[in-house]
Amino acid sequence: MRHTREEVIKRTISEYRKLDRVVSKLTPAQWRRRVPRPETKDPWTVKDSLAHITHWKADTARSIRGDPRPPEERGLNMTEGNRLVYLRWRKRSPRDVLAWHRQVQKDVLAALRAAPNKVFSGRSRDPDWPGDLDGHSASHRIQDIERAVQSPGRQKRSSARR
């Protein structure tokens, strides 16, 4: 499937607004709530999930700009990359992560607007491309963040994933 700049930007803005609406009103206790994860994975909180979403959005902007991957991220598999993000951000405040989330959205939109047309229409891509800007974000928003901030009784009935 070929995409248009306008369609990708529209999807990106739509998901950002949904996510920002949720995280903008979190209490300090909600930021610290654990999200459903297998015991073998790092113990993410709501804050860690937002940092994860934001990192991969920033990585998409980097890729769209044609910038190289940072040396410390080269050659990492998905689990190793996710762990690196967790270790970088786990001691940072929710305020820092929220500010980064908002700055990265500006960076993403700038990258999308500045990208050559061939980025969007040069080759066929998956329907949800670029996935980290909407589908991946929506998945973590719904399955991690929104689930974790539900009432505790409903949260306990949720099954762990990943």
Regions picked out by a protein language model, each given a short descriptive name:
Residues 15, 81-119:
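Acidic/histidine-rich alpha-helical segments that form the ligand environment
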Residues 7, 11, 48, 52, ...:
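Alpha-helical initiation/capping and key positions within long helical/coiled-coil segments
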Residues 1-18:
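Extreme N-terminal tail/first-helix region
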Residues 32-83, 117-162:
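Short, contiguous alpha-helical
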Residues 16-27, 57-62, 102-116, 142, ...:
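Structural signal for well-ordered, non-membrane alpha-helices
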Residues 1-4, 38-41, 86-93, 126:
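Short amphipathic alpha-helical segments at helix-loop
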